[in-house]
Amino acid sequence: MKLFIIIVVTSLTISKVFDKTLVTIEARNLRKMDRHEHFNANEDFVEAKMLKKIDNKNNLNNRCINDFAPTNPGHNSGIGHPKVINNKFTKDFAPTNPGHSPGIGHLRVVNNKFTNDFAPTNPGNSPGIRHP
């Protein structure tokens, strides 16, 4: 018990000491935020790039398709090549009759009858537990 308390206190002390060290990052420097810029609802960012306005709206789906050049001739849809997104609204609501909705909360009853599905096998030919 005493060893456990020593280990816990030591690990907490080490975590407090190393919590004050410099934070290192890889790849690119992060943008310094002096004020609450990350709570600004008027701007949409994709890796700190301001998106183009289409129909006076900032929208992630409305970004320009030609922002990335393909690496090989042809139509690549791989890394760095955004898919073409159809921005049209489609009304896909399909009403159903009451009582015939197999969605959430509705159980689909197939058959309420009891069937005896026991099928006896010959001794030695049982593929159950502990049988190869």
Curated annotation (Swiss-Prot):
GO CC terms, sorted: apoplast; extracellular region
Organism: Arabidopsis thaliana
UniProt GO MF annotations: hormone activity
Subunit structure: Interacts with CEP receptors (e.g. CEPR1 and CEPR2).
A Gene Ontology biological process term: regulation of leaf morphogenesis
Record PTM Hydroxyproline, positions in chain: 70, 73, 95, 98, 102, 120, 123, 127
Leader sequence segment: 1-19
Domain of life: Eukaryota
Proregion residues excised on maturation: 20-66, 82-91, 107-116, 132
Keyword Signal applies: yes
Protein name (Swiss-Prot/TrEMBL): Precursor of CEP10
InterPro entries reported for this sequence: CEP
Entry's family note: Belongs to the C-terminally encoded plant signaling peptide (CEP) family.
Keywords, comma-separated and alphabetical: Apoplast, Developmental protein, Hormone, Hydroxylation, Secreted, Signal
Functional summary from the UniProt entry: Extracellular signaling peptide that may regulate primary root growth rate and systemic nitrogen (N)-demand signaling.
